[in-house]
């Protein structure tokens, strides 16, 4: 006896129904709120069913994660499937397509019965992959914030010290700090440099480099001084201007530190997965893009052939043929994960 539990998950509640082959309804669609009492009641009900029971739900957003964790921790078979598979599934032979929580739960239950032997059980490794994906999305979010903060600082420097962001091209340190950012924190206005003599600035710059742990060069000091001599600043050298620039630097440094910490933690977590050494051995992939690729692909073993992975990324050309018409060149479907496509693009851009 097969029991298919279909769960349509929302933020604060889920709609649950239980079906058996032959469209037998064991439990009509009902709402279960996400609290300990109602979840435990649902667990007891599912465990009390006769026969084999499998729970199926869509892995949409983050809402499904508490439910799948609670049920799987209770020893119940739970499978979280791609919502596109549920959307494209239709066994009703009807033109009606109701979009309600009850209808969705029933559709998920019917899908579970139809794909009974193919349902993959959610496990501890899936929790690691979900955590990795969340960290990667946070990494992308803070990278966007870092870019915005960097552009904001450069815009302020255009008013106080034009071109100062181009004085150095050194890469970011492990803590996220960069030489040009630290430089403009101390020399936040062009008059902070040209207001001194060349000798005085060179000595001050040398002490600054030693204190910050940066390389010092007399030629570089002279170059900065000469470039600063002819610049025009729109904002005056006063406390308000100093506050604006230094505040922008502080925010940028804080965001940069978060980005670098996430970068390290993502790599550390990804290294616990079995595919990590294989992915890092690929061309164009390092300790940043490798973990991102692993995070966005998820469990690669669920793809039975390479075409399935291509379709998941949405880079497969769809067919366009009808009668005598057959298109030779088709655009990619772009039906899959945009985050995965972005990662793949960055990798290929580096290789080419």
Name these PLM-found stretches.
Residues 1-352:
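A detector of single, family-specific signature residues
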């Amino acid at each position: 006896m097969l029991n298919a539990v279909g769960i349509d998950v929302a933020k604060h509640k889920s709609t649950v129904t239980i079906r058996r082959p032959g469209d037998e309804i064991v439990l009509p669609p009902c709402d279960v709120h996400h609290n300990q009492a109602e979840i435990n009641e649902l667990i007891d009900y599912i465990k009390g069913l006769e026969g084999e029971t499998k729970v199926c739900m869509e892995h949409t957003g983050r809402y499904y994660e508490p439910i799948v964790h609670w049920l799987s921790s209770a020893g119940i078979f739970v499978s979280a499937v791609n919502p596109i598979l549920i959307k494209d599934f239709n066994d009703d032979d009807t033109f009606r397509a109701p979009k309600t929580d009850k209808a969705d739960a029933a559709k998920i239950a019917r899908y579970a019965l139809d794909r009974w032997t193919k349902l993959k059980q959610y496990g501890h490794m899936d929790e690691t992959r979900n955590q990795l994906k969340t960290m990667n999305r946070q990494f992308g979010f803070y990278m966007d914030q870092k870019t915005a903060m960097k552009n904001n600082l450069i815009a302020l420097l255009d008013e106080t010290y034009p071109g100062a962001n181009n004085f150095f091209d050194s890469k970011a340190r492990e803590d996220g700090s960069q030489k040009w950012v630290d430089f403009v924190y101390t020399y936040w206005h062009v008059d902070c440099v040209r207001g001194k003599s060349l000798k005085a600035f060179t000595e001050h710059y040398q002490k600054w480099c030693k204190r910050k742990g940066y390389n010092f060069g007399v030629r570089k000091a002279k170059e900065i001084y000469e470039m600063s001599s002819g610049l025009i600043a729109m904002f005056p050298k006063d406390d308000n201007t100093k506050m604006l620039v230094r505040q922008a630097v502080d925010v940028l440094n804080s965001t940069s530190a978060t980005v670098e910490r996430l970068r390290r933690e993502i790599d550390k977590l990804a290294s616990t997965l079995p595919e990590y050494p294989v992915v890092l051995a690929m061309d164009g992939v390092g300790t940043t893009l490798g973990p991102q690729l692993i995070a966005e692909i998820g469990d690669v073993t669920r793809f039975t052939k390479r075409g399935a992975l291509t379709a998941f990324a949405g880079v497969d050309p769809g067919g366009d043929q009808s009668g005598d018409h057959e298109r030779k060149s088709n655009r990619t479907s772009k039906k899959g994960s945009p985050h995965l496509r972005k990662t793949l693009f960055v990798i290929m851009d580096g290789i080419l």
